[in-house]
Structure formats: structure tokens, C-alpha cells
Regions:
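Conserved nucleotide-binding/hydrolysis micro-motifs of P-loop NTPases
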Residues: 22, 73-75
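TIR-domain catalytic/interaction hotspot
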Residues: 1-60
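C-terminal interaction surface of TIR/SEFIR-family domains
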Residues: 76-141
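Short hydrophobic alpha-helical runs that function as membrane-insertion/retention elements
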Residues: 15-17, 65-70
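Catalytic cores of processing enzymes, dominated by hydrolases/peptidases
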Residues: 56, 64, 71-73
Length: 141
């Protein structure tokens, strides 16, 4: 983790791509939960690399802009979880929209889409702000 943190300190932002990595053929989430939560089926769902959880959390703690893309089928849990924002959109737990992509679709079309252009321009703006603010004294409030 020290090496990752060192790289983060030298960075101005982070892009994480949560690709499908490990397939759960048959599984159950929260089986026999003692806190009253319902169990759910995890069969034929995908896990991604644990670094897709670790690195965005570290970047967030350092105040870096984080953009996460999640491949369709990857379990949306932890930092990859999406929640309704009250306006009909789903946002990630970091408070920004988290796009889901499908490798079976034409990605060139997605990268030309209005959705992608808005997302990447917004993230780029956050990164530019980090670059502008580096070297300035920290502000507590």
C-alpha cells in the first residue's frame, strides 16, 4: 500500500476501470445474516480486482478526483455501489455518476456519446483544479 500511496501523492486524479475478473458460478450474499438483512443470489455474477476498491478509496482520502467505470455484470458493492440520487440517476458512493460499460457493445460509440463527454469533461475539470491548487497552503475550511 505504501507504493500505491506514493504514486497517489504524485497524481492529480484517478481513473479506475472495474473489469470482470472472477465469476461466481453459484453463491449467496448475506446468508443466515444475524442483522436481519435479506440474503440475495450471487450466482453468475462477477467480481473485479480488489484494487478497484482500494485505490479509489485511497485517492478519495487524499482529495483526488476519482472516476470509476464498472463493466456490466460486476457486482456493485462497496465503492462500486450505486445509489439513486433523487433525480432518477444513479450515483456512486463517491457522489458522482458511475458509468457502466458493456464490452459486447461498440465502445467507440460510447466514447463519442454525450454522456461520456460530460463525464470526462467534469472529471478533467476536477483534475485541473487539483493541478491549480497544488503547492498552495492547505485550507481547513
Amino acid at each position: 500500500l505504501t507504493a500505491i500511496r506514493r504514486l497517489m501523492l504524485e497524481s492529480n486524479g484517478l481513473v479506475t476501470i472495474a473489469f470482470r475478473r472472477s465469476l461466481i458460478k453459484q453463491g449467496t450474499g448475506k446468508p443466515i445474516s444475524d442483522i436481519g438483512e435479506e440474503e440475495y443470489d450471487l450466482s453468475n455474477k462477477w467480481l473485479t480486482s480488489p484494487y478497484c476498491q482500494i485505490e479509489p478509496a485511497m485517492a478519495f482520502q487524499l482529495g483526488l478526483p476519482v472516476l470509476i467505470l464498472r463493466e456490466k455484470g460486476v457486482i456493485a458493492e462497496g465503492i462500486l455501489e450505486v445509489l439513486p440520487d433523487g433525480y432518477g440517476f444513479l450515483k456512486g458512493v463517491l457522489g458522482v455518476y458511475m458509468p457502466e460499460f458493456d464490452l459486447n457493445c461498440n465502445l467507440d460509440d460510447y466514447f463519442k456519446s454525450k454522456e461520456w463527454i460530460q463525464i470526462i469533461q467534469k472529471w478533467e475539470g476536477y483534475v485541473r483544479k487539483v493541478v491549480d491548487n497544488k503547492g498552495k497552503p492547505p485550507m481547513l475550511y
